[in-house]
Structure formats: C-alpha cells, structure tokens
C-alpha cells in the first residue's frame, strides 16, 4: 500500500509557498505554522515527521540533511541550497523542480534530494 505523502515546509519558508504548491502541484503541502511546528527545534520537527511516517520536509536549514543522514528516514528531505530570495523567486524555482524531487523521494529509496 502506497502512503499519501505530504510535504512539510520548514519555518524559514513562507506559508504562501504552501498555498501555491497546494493549488498548483496536487501535492499536499503544509506550512510549519499550520502544523504548529514553528516554535519547535529541528529535532522535534524531525521526530514529529518521523512519527507520521509519510512526510517529506522541505527546508533551507543545514541541520536537516545531517539529521536525516544520521538518524535515517522517515522523514525524507528536499534540501534547498538557493540562498535568500523572495517568495516569487522561490516559487518559480520550486515550480521547475518540485515534481521531479517528489517523484524521486516517493518512488525510490533516496532519502535526500538537494535542489540548488
């Protein structure tokens, strides 16, 4: 049985990105604010995502690749390495790459996809 995967956006990514992704990709995307994760540590977020099991974290944070590499998946991770940018620029970048990254993570044993 295939899980219905969700993408959880880290606190450093605007909830507006979640809204756009939900509307345009068909992927369930939730912001850290909608999940009440915005005041938690990275480890706490990792543990909550791990407990759910069908989560892909989307983050610019350098701590998440280390956590997933050290502790394993779930959760899986899309690690953004594009620097600071406004929401429109970030959405334009994600629009080009998110479907392929999602497909790789949900259909293979790959735990981390880095987008740069």
Question: Residue spans of the language-model regions?
Answer:
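Short, hinge-like loop/turn segments at secondary-structure boundaries
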Residues: 47-49, 74-77
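Histidine/acidic-residue-rich catalytic or RNA/ligand-binding cores of hydrolases
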Residues: 69, 73
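C-terminal structural segments of small proteins and small subunits
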Residues: 75-115
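Acidic, metal-binding active-site segment of PIN/NYN-like and related structure-specific nucleases
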Residues: 49-50, 54-68
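Conserved beta-strand termini and adjacent loop/short-helix elements that scaffold enzyme active sites
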Residues: 32-34, 60, 80, 115-116
């Amino acid at each position: 049985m295939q899980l219905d995967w969700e993408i959880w956006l880290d606190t450093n990514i605007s909830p507006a990105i979640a809204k756009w992704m939900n509307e345009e990709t068909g992927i369930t995307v939730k912001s850290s604010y909608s999940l009440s994760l915005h005041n938690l540590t990275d480890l706490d977020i990792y543990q909550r995502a791990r407990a759910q099991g069908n989560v892909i974290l989307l983050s610019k944070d350098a701590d998440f690749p280390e956590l997933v590499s050290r502790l394993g998946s779930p959760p899986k991770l899309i690690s953004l390495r594009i620097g600071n940018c406004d929401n429109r620029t970030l959405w334009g970048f994600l629009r080009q790459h998110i479907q392929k990254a999602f497909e790789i993570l949900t259909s293979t044993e790959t735990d981390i996809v880095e987008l740069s």
